[in-house]
Amino acid sequence: MAIERTLSIIKPDATKRNLTGKINAKFEEAGLRIVAQKRIQLTLAQAGQFYAEHKERPFYGELTEFMTSEPVVVQVLEGEGAILKNREVMGATNPANADEGTIRKEFALSVGENSVHGSDSPEAAAREIAFFFSGLELVG
């Protein structure tokens, strides 16, 4: 399997509860390296641009409001098959359906407040990483 990079966002429900370290430990235990990380406060415009593909969905307004409600931690994870591995570590979007030991099973509060975001494809990973990081910020 190839070495990949993927974007991860630790969402406001998790940063508010000081879960960044526990979530990072899950990534590292799964063999993912954190090659870039920063804590930021998204603006409504930034959240709207990042989630533009969901603009016509009924949850878009709630999503962008939530993502700007508290700081988030954006990070680039690297490793063999990082995109799929990250999605496995995160667990199902709905924490009720997530496997034991996954981030969402342990930390998510609801489907909307599900603690983490992860890129779902190589194309999304490239686009999402470039949205938050310059090449100079990626140290691997």
Swiss-Prot record:
Q: Per its UniProt record, what SUPFAM superfamilies does this chain match?
A: Nucleoside diphosphate kinase, NDK
Q: Which cofactor does it need?
A: Mg(2+)
Alphabetically, the GO molecular function entries are: ATP binding; metal ion binding; nucleoside diphosphate kinase activity
According to its UniProt entry, the protein's GO biological process terms are: CTP biosynthetic process; GTP biosynthetic process; UTP biosynthetic process
InterPro entries from the UniProt entry: NDK-like_dom (IPR034907), NDK-like_dom_sf (IPR036850), Nucleoside_diP_kinase (IPR001564), Nucleoside_diP_kinase_AS (IPR023005)
The answer on whether this UniProt entry bears the keyword Glycoprotein reads: no
Active site location: 117 (pros-phosphohistidine intermediate)
Q: Which Pfam families match?
A: NDK
A cellular component term, taken from the record's GO annotations: cytoplasm
Q: What class of enzyme is it?
A: transferase
Binding residue positions for ATP: 11, 59, 87, 93, 104, 114
- EC number(s)? 2.7.4.6
Q: How is this protein organized at the quaternary level?
A: Homotetramer.
Q: What does this protein do?
A: Major role in the synthesis of nucleoside triphosphates other than ATP. The ATP gamma phosphate is transferred to the NDP beta phosphate via a ping-pong mechanism, using a phosphorylated active-site intermediate.
The UniProt family comment states: Belongs to the NDK family.
Stored HAMAP family = NDP_kinase (MF_00451)
PANTHER family, from UniProt?
Answer: NUCLEOSIDE DIPHOSPHATE KINASE, NUCLEOSIDE DIPHOSPHATE KINASE DDB_G0292928-RELATED
Report what the protein is called.
Answer: Nucleoside diphosphate kinase
